[in-house]
Amino acid sequence: MSWQNNLRSVSPYIAGEQPELTDIIKLNTNENPYPPTSVAQLFNERYKTKNLRLYPSTDAKSLRKKLADYHHLEVEQVIIGNGSDEVLSLSFLTFFNSQSPLLMPDITYSFYPIYCELYRIPFQKVPVDDDFKVLIKDYCIENGGIVIANPDAPTALALNLKDIEEILKKNQNSIVLINEAYIDFGGETCLPLLKKYDNLVVVQTFSKSRSLAGIRLGVAYGSAEAISHLYDVKNSFNSYPIDSLAQIIGEASLMDEHYFQKNIQKIIKTREVFKDNLVNLGFEVTDSKANFVFVHHPKVKAEELFKALYEAKIIVRHWNQPRIDDWLRITIGTNKEMNKVIEFLKGYLKKNEEIDEWKK
Amino acid sequence: MSWQNNLRSVSPYIAGEQPELTDIIKLNTNENPYPPTSVAQLFNERYKTKNLRLYPSTDAKSLRKKLADYHHLEVEQVIIGNGSDEVLSLSFLTFFNSQSPLLMPDITYSFYPIYCELYRIPFQKVPVDDDFKVLIKDYCIENGGIVIANPDAPTALALNLKDIEEILKKNQNSIVLINEAYIDFGGETCLPLLKKYDNLVVVQTFSKSRSLAGIRLGVAYGSAEAISHLYDVKNSFNSYPIDSLAQIIGEASLMDEHYFQKNIQKIIKTREVFKDNLVNLGFEVTDSKANFVFVHHPKVKAEELFKALYEAKIIVRHWNQPRIDDWLRITIGTNKEMNKVIEFLKGYLKKNEEIDEWKK
């Protein structure tokens, strides 16, 4: 016997690298290339840090109300957490307390199985089809809950509302958790379905479309009943998860709708041009509705390309995982950054072709 | 069957009220009456919020290093969390994964049993003696871990290092978690015992002595091995728990040792004067080593006094709980605030005495 016998054994999630080099093109963690609204700067500068001696609002009351108004929901339908990872984690702990398996696509956010291991939640991976599409009919089996990212990471593919409604309808005895971290980049939010389904919980984040990954704000929306249970678990975990500065910066973000929309449109435009350029270079690219693309080249091993990009100080994401080990996920940066990526790829593919020719 | 069947049932912690009134004397959540160092204001004003588009360091690297240096520890012996409540919560999840009960005093921080319920950890409350003292010999029974607050809340009593070492020695097969949230107000930290015991984990916070409850920074110190396990669980829960602003404000706090020490001494001085005044009014007061006092008056029901104080806009803390339902916990505020409390109590006790006289 030793204290080591009482440890919870887990295999933790490994987040995308945050390299300390400064002259890199960082396209590996789906951060927004543009800053948050300047209102955030203003609010932060004006904040009197003497107020930090006091605890923050336990439910980020004012921000919570503003989010409810923004989405035409009741305040009781909203809960804010310390980034969407915390919201997801506490949702798993709250809602998936079943002997039946939680269902999730086999290709999706790799944190889900880690939450399951942490909380001892049985789960079952449901294979997507050869085009990485989620097949609705596969989610009509016995389960203790369902989690789907829409759009998905890393595939970047989105589901339509009709498909999500079908899943909700067929699973009224399970919570269906839809992770909409990337929804603002072209997907269709399922928040309107909250009017009809009390088993729907939708998670969103300030990290991507609102350029606030550094301040850690995630949100879940659901029926007032579902959210009240999530609050009970949150209040059994941490009374004050959102610090006072994060609360005011979140509010600042909501005040500048014009900048928010402009920022998103810029990224979508860059994505579409980047996709066209990739296709012209012979890449296969999924129909991205996110701020990243998922790509594959028939003539180049993804792992080799990943390393070549890394050496050129362009950091993207690659997983050594069945079905996607020949694919790369590339975040959409600025136009200038994406042009540099295309230039690099052109040179790389040309050199590769020459070597192939020479081998013949 | 319904989705409600799969819910985790919990009875959440209820934090001390954060009233929205402005002209109150707020002595109910052990906040510091003085602001944090002015370096925090400076750092915050200068921060460029454009950097918030990027994720923060997953382990608050720079702050972690500074804390290690401050306490003459290795960086691997330090983990930072989103307030000490998160650090405690993740410590329970990591270390107390046993069939044997976790031991804790019966009178202590009331969040501990709530973590146990959340994570299904068996626990056993060990009665303190009639003077609220923790009896070391009672912790030499079979257990899956031990958690003790030093100084304790709400009793305000501290243990000495010899007693803590005795517990560590007798329980080398269990993690002994010492919650030092209030240690800077007169207790003796057990951090030096980390040199000898790899089963010791010490939790501290920026919320009390550093006047930073609003920014949510808690810390655990332990052996490099214990902390690495805590990191594995943290990284299975949330990759980025500390936002970028909290990290720089924590660093600002560590840069102003002079202000920090002065602030603590002021509070201790106010506490000692307040205690003397209370004793002169006939109160029983425990030997506080914290930024609050735990008090009882032989002639007045605590609950009635709590209500009378509340009506006078002086908010303190009372628990309807066996053994302490006739006690109040009062945070140490400014001299001016504590003088007002004494003035109120004088008037209240005098009126009470007159009523008693009249009844005869």
From Swiss-Prot, chains A, B:
What is the disulfide pattern of this chain? none
Q: Which cofactor does it need?
A: pyridoxal 5'-phosphate
Q: Which residues carry this modification: N6-(pyridoxal phosphate)lysine?
A: K208
Task: From the UniProt record, give one GO term of the biological process aspect.
Answer: L-histidine biosynthetic process
Q: Name one GO molecular function term.
A: histidinol-phosphate transaminase activity
Which EC number(s) does UniProt give? 2.6.1.9
Per the record, the pathway is:
Amino-acid biosynthesis; L-histidine biosynthesis; L-histidine from 5-phospho-alpha-D-ribose 1-diphosphate: step 7/9
Q: Which SUPFAM superfamilies match?
A: PLP-dependent transferases (SSF53383)
Name the domain of life this protein comes from: Bacteria
Q: Tell me what reaction this enzyme catalyses.
A: L-histidinol phosphate + 2-oxoglutarate = 3-(imidazol-4-yl)-2-oxopropyl phosphate + L-glutamate
Main EC class the enzyme belongs to: transferase
The family database entries (InterPro entries) matched by this protein are listed as: Aminotrans_II_pyridoxalP_BS (IPR001917), Aminotransferase_I/II_large (IPR004839), HisP_aminotrans (IPR005861), HistidinolP_aminotransfase (IPR050106), PyrdxlP-dep_Trfase (IPR015424), PyrdxlP-dep_Trfase_major (IPR015421), PyrdxlP-dep_Trfase_small (IPR015422)
PANTHER family according to UniProt: HISTIDINOL-PHOSPHATE AMINOTRANSFERASE (PTHR43643:SF3), HISTIDINOL-PHOSPHATE AMINOTRANSFERASE 2 (PTHR43643)
Task: Note the HAMAP family from the entry.
Answer: HisC_aminotrans_2
- Family membership: Belongs to the class-II pyridoxal-phosphate-dependent aminotransferase family. Histidinol-phosphate aminotransferase subfamily.
Q: Assembly state and interactors?
A: Homodimer.
What name appears for this protein in its UniProt entry?
Answer: Histidinol-phosphate aminotransferase
User: Per the UniProt entry, what species is this protein from, by scientific name?
Assistant: Lactococcus lactis subsp. lactis (strain IL1403) (Streptococcus lactis)
